[in-house]
Amino acid sequence: ASYGITKGLSLQGDMETIFCMPKPSGEEEKFLKIIGMNQVPIVWRDINYDYLKSRLLEMSPEEYYSFRDHIYADFSYMHVNDLGCMEFAGGYPGNLHEEINNFSIIAGVVARQQEFDIIHAHDWLTYPAGVHAKMVSGKPLCIHVHATDFDRSRGKVNPTVYSIEKNGMDHADCIMCVSELTRRTVINEYHQDPRKVFAMHNAVYPLSQELLDIPRPEHPKEKVVTFLGRITMQKGPEYFVEAAALVLQRTRNIRFVMAGSGDMLNAMINLVAERGIADRFHFPGFMKGKQVYEVYKNSDVFVMPSVSEPFGIAPLEAMQCGTPS
């Protein structure tokens, strides 16, 4: 969703987007300015220019020095590398809340150094950073709610996560929700003023010719049914496995694919083994880029058994590939 939004904004012509991400890989498209938060110093270090050039990925030494001049507090007690920067594990590490706090600290440096008109923070992981940037700059904060903890936890809300979500919403000038369902949740469960909460539906970016030209393999003797997404509680992966077990009691000429990663992956592998359907089940792992559309094209049916889905993009992607959802 963030890719589509930033790509669309970049085509407006009169708008510049600065994308702050914890840990750039270097493979990102260059249609916008990327700031790797793991390259923004929070502790002053006297670093040689040539050494900086060899170490920095998405940042020039000049920009590093400018960020260094905007360090606003003594963070020498924090764990930093030789550049005075904090490292990020990426994904959902065990110290996730620590990384959220670290991201917020760095946002304070960025907000003091960059010039911008509005702050756009996506989901609870970046709300503290957005709030900090607003407090530093005085610029309006728009938060984008892709899901709430009521969706992710099946109603068993984590009080810490809820507190972070509500604090972000309380400080936001505008709250964008991916669906009317999410908007109602924000208003009713987080007690937000309806006048600042808007439904802004997701969409898919038109496919390139390269993706449209991906061939659809023929497998006339069997059908392929696919689950593609995060293998987490919210997405209901166990329902996909249980449904597959029921179908395979009727016919064996179907293969089931569960593509993705998540904290329930190992449990699903074990459940497939317990149901005795491992010979009909495939776990290809996390898919990205072209691989996603190759999976869709290789499927006869796409299934999304989510328990709570604010607005699922995956069915639209499958439909783009001509795969029933």
Task: Identify the residue ranges that each predicted region occupies.
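A conserved catalytic-core segment of Leloir-type glycosyltransferases
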Residues: Q12, I18-A111
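Nucleotide-sugar donor phosphate/pyrophosphate-binding loop at the beta->alpha transition
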Residues: E99-I106, K139-C142, F150-N167, P206
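Conserved donor-binding/catalytic core segment of Leloir-type glycosyltransferases
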Residues: M176, E218-A244
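Nucleotide-activated donor-binding/catalytic signature segment of Leloir-type glycosyltransferases, i.e.
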Residues: A267-M287
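Short alpha-helical donor nucleotide-sugar binding micro-motif in glycosyltransferases
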Residues: F286-M287, E294-S299
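Aromatic "clamp/platform" in nucleotide-sugar-dependent glycosyltransferases that forms part
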Residues: V307
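Short glycine/serine-rich donor-binding loops of glycosyltransferases
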Residues: G312-P315
